[in-house]
């Protein structure tokens, strides 16, 4: 690599680190529709049997309440992927849905519909890798999500049935309700072994996970 290219890559990396730190320090995104506390009877369940898992069998459980359209979630996605690579065999990473933006419910439906065919993670990655194609649009982006399902080679009849199944919507709404009852008001919000995390840096996240694994 040339010196100029090396310098450019170093500057880009540094800028990304600064952005992630700033997002963690600033707190999460409450979205266009803020999730207020749920005062209905009952308490929130942090992880349900049908909660999507990106890894299993770990000694610690890391839970993220996320919104696929949330700018902070999108910016922190590479960091979460790095944590998964670093700790994936020792930590169970769980996704909980907290849709707050215009197309985030439809995105969550696409992810859950893909999960019916064992492809949650593939759709999860696709959604986070392509926010510029569908995010922050005033019009529904269902056609885009169905296009992603085709690209992933899913059975489209099964995908459509799952996407439109009231039970799929119910799972997502249950996840959001759980989050509200647990005090989640924005995304991303993290929990580790049942305790809420309020990190201000990536190092804080790593230190918390390391402590949980000791």
Predicted regions and their residues:
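Loop/turn elements at helix/coil->beta-strand transitions in domains of secreted/extracellular proteins
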Residues: 59-61, 88-92, 118-122, 154-156, ...
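Structural microenvironment flanking redox-active thiols in thiol-disulfide oxidoreductases
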Residues: 86-149
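Solvent-exposed loop/turn segments at secondary-structure junctions
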Residues: 68-71, 98-103, 129-134, 165-168, ...
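Stable alpha-helical elements in mature extracytoplasmic
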Residues: 58, 76-79, 106-110, 119-123, ...
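Extracytoplasmic thiol/disulfide redox context detector
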Residues: 1-100, 173-176, 211-214
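C-terminal cap of thioredoxin/glutaredoxin-like
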Residues: 1-27, 150-214
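Sec/Tat-exported extracytoplasmic proteins
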Residues: 69, 84-87, 115-118, 127, ...
